[in-house]
Amino acid sequence: MAKYDKADIERRMAGAVESLKSDLSGLRTGRANTSLLDPVVVEVYGAMMPLNQVATVNAPEPRMLAVQVWDKANVSAVEKGITKANLGLNPMTDGQTVRLPMPDLTEERRKELAKLAGQYAEKAKIAIRNVRRDGMEDLKADEKAKDISEDDRKRMEDEVQKLTDKYVAEADSAAEAKEKEIMTQ
């Protein structure tokens, strides 16, 4: 039984790029974006929950996020979760609504965020290369088990390498676009 599965390898590489794009969407630029609060977790009812399970997030103004907490008892926990997420936001409470004005990004903070985007991209590229390594190992195991010939293994290794190059390039371009967005806002 052959271990190598090209579709699985491509799916896992695409997953790494999607994860990168999700991470990058959480990086703050100058504008209010509800996805900025996606990584925020809140300690409520004795458990850690994503913010979107205890409140609604919207952007009423271009430079303001509003978090409408469903249960008034959770307002302080939501504030604490936002502060702990270290997003550089200063929550202001107004009843059951937590308002988050978007401060202007300093040049120093822009550089930090651009560097963080690069780190996220590197993490994604490592994941892609790990998938590549798994695929190459599966091909060698298939050849050893006489499921495929040496020529087939080499041809399939080339396919895996092409997929790797494609997804690494996608990761690079996503990170470059985010870095450009951060530095020009």
UniProtKB/Swiss-Prot annotation:
GO molecular function ontology, one term from the record: ribosomal large subunit binding
Source species, domain of life: Bacteria
Organism the protein comes from: Erythrobacter litoralis (strain HTCC2594)
Family: Belongs to the RRF family.
Coiled-coil stretches: none
Region (Disordered): 137-159
This protein's UniProt keywords: Cytoplasm, Protein biosynthesis
Protein name as annotated: Ribosome-recycling factor
Intrachain S-S bonds: none
